[in-house]
A protein has these predicted regions:
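Flexible glycine/acidic-rich beta-alpha junction loops that bind and position SAM and/or redox cofactors
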Residues: 13-19, 108-110, 183, 232-234, ...
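Radical SAM enzyme core and accessory elements
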Residues: 2-8, 50, 65, 135, ...
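Conserved beta-strand positions
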Residues: 8, 74, 121, 224-226, ...
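Acidic, low-complexity intrinsically disordered segments
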Residues: 2-218
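Radical SAM [4Fe-4S] cluster-binding motif and immediate context
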Residues: 156-323, 328-330, 334-343
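Structural recognition of alpha->loop->beta junctions
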Residues: 111-130, 274-282, 342-355
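A C-terminal junction/extension of Radical SAM enzymes
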Residues: 54-58, 147-151, 155-157, 321, ...
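Amphipathic alpha-helical segments that form well-ordered structural scaffolds
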Residues: 40-44, 243, 406
Length: 504
């Protein structure tokens, strides 16, 4: 097989809660995270093949790159759908063969049958070798997908081909320890994409991936993209985390880790202690709702029969900042949910609280139930913060959308955001002292925060209050406070933009 040239394309994300569009300019970055899936796919391709990666979140796609390629590989999430359509249209003008994979196509490839030449669906470790074999034998098939419950052993997965991107354009790098989630939330499509039995990498592989980032001179944030990092606690506590701790000590702690976990981490002090010692300082938790009936209705049983506020307090007391995901629009929600949600978030001290409207992703249990009830309206947009909903809710639609907008604007108003930040600082107790390096990048972000947040924008009064309070009371946390002030600016701008959207 001749040396094939592959252009790997990552479509653009719209402005969303997690895009950090208004925060990234403070630190001179163009995107929050790199396309980990495509970088892994690139590493799975034959070494002798030519490879280029264009992330449309950091650079423009030019005709020269398209002309260069024999194949164009596209991977995307649902939120990138509009950009995907534009990319397909652009590439097809050059008569190039398009190969598509990733979450969007795995769940909804039927939508793109007329536009895509070949689909390589599911996890690439299973289906990409089949595509390569078929290409070698000139027997290419339109659709390659895994057998039901066919999941790869990810301990054999290759190290992502980081050399294809310009790391300086990103705020964080990404790494993966596990795939799959043992829980069965009605609205979640993770079990469709990755299964319910968590599969893990061994400690040797994790250290190899950390070494790869370190040797390419990356220093700073590293996001473990696992949907539930603590799905295999025994392995984490006995093998992986102790290995990361030793690695970090040898390398003088070059990385700050964050990840996603379930609320039951609050029940395991040993695990939290090991994570903090390994360098973790932030965990995202799907709290979803303060309404226990809504939690039961969506099968979020890991969140019931516990005091959620106390669990959050325990985690933050242990030195892990909790970022929270919340959902409005469950069948059990009444108009009281808006005030209930706002009050819970304020009391929790969760500074980064992502409140979204319930969406029904295709083929999930929620989608199937709503289909049987004839309540589906459209495909989801992939963003649950854009004031759209793809089914007929039990609550009056106008009341739901307007109540949602009020809730988001309330929690991200400067007064409430900075009050929540203060509540967090009172509970947060960093257990491990790390040397904070004042880089030029961070110093520039600090100066920009003074000008934009402290002088130009509406949060200036609250910014200066917490600025001087932190200098006197919590000088050790001062860099974190400035970072959170910058994030708050982004969240406010996004919530204000979405609140102007008219819905019918």
């Amino acid at each position: 097989m001749r040396n094939v040239k592959v252009l790997l394309l990552y479509p653009k994300f719209p402005k969303t809660f997690w895009s950090f569009k208004y925060a990234l300019p403070f630190i001179g970055k163009r995107a929050a995270f790199p396309p980990l899936g495509l970088l892994t796919v690139a590493a799975l391709l034959p070494k002798e093949w030519g490879k280029k990666l264009v992330d449309l979140n950091t650079q423009k796609l030019n005709e020269k790159d398209i002309n260069w390629a024999d194949f164009v590989f596209i991977s995307a999430m649902v939120a990138q759908k509009e950009s995907v359509k534009e990319v397909i249209s652009q590439v097809k003008r050059f008569n190039k063969k398009i190969v598509a994979g990733g979450p969007l196509f795995t769940i909804s490839y039927e939508e793109f049958l007329n536009d895509i030449d070949y689909f390589v669906l599911g996890e690439a470790e299973v289906t990409l070798p089949l595509f390569l074999e078929n290409l070698k034998n000139s027997t290419l098939q339109k659709i390659i997908k895994p057998e039901p419950n066919q999941w790869p052993d990810i301990s054999q997965t290759v190290v992502p081909l980081w050399e294809l991107i310009d790391m300086k354009k990103y705020a964080s790098m990404s790494i993966q320890f596990s795939r799959g989630c043992p829980f069965n939330c009605e609205f979640c499509d993770i079990i469709l994409l990755n299964g319910r039995v968590p599969r893990i990498k061994d400690k040797i592989q994790i250290l190899k991936e950390l070494d790869a980032l370190y040797n390419l001179n990356w220093r700073g944030n590293v996001f473990f993209v696992d949907d539930n990092f603590i799905s295999n606690k025994i392995n984490l506590k006995e093998k992986v985390l102790p290995a990361i701790i030793k690695w970090g000590e040898r390398k003088k702690h070059p990385f700050i880790f964050n990840t996603q976990v379930s609320i039951n981490i609050a029940d395991d002090k040993e695990l939290m202690d090991l994570m903090v010692r390994a360098g973790f300082n932030t965990v995202f938790i799907g709290i979803e709702s303060p309404n226990e009936e809504s939690l039961k209705g969506c099968n979020k049983f890991q969140n019931i029969n516990r005091n959620l506020l106390e669990s959050i307090r325990i985690i933050q007391n242990q030195g892990l900042e909790v970022q929270g995901g919340f959902i409005i629009g469950f069948d059990q929600d009444t108009p009281s949910i808006f005030n209930q949600m706002s009050l819970f978030i304020q009391r929790s001290g969760i500074v980064t609280a992502m409140v979204g409207l319930l969406q029904a992703p295709p083929k999930t249990r929620l989608w199937e139930r709503l289909r049987k009830e004839k309540r589906l309206i459209s495909q989801p947009t992939g963003s649950n913060t854009d004031c759209t909903i793809n089914f007929q809710p039990k609550m009056n639609l106008h009341s739901l959308i307007s109540g949602y907008k009020r809730t988001v604007n309330h929690i991200y108003s400067p007064k409430n955001y900075y009050q929540r930040l203060m509540n967090f600082l009172k509970e947060y107790k960093p257990r491990v002292k790390r040397n904070y390096q004042l880089t030029f990048e961070r110093f520039l972000a600090f100066l920009k925060s003074i000008w934009i947040l402290g002088i130009k924008e509406k949060e200036r009064v609250y910014y200066w209050k917490i600025f001087f309070w932190a200098l006197i009371k919590k000088p050790r946390l001062f860099p974190i406070i400035i970072e959170m002030a910058i994030k708050g600016f982004h969240f406010r701008k996004i919530s204000e933009e979405y609140s102007k959207i008219t819905t019918h």
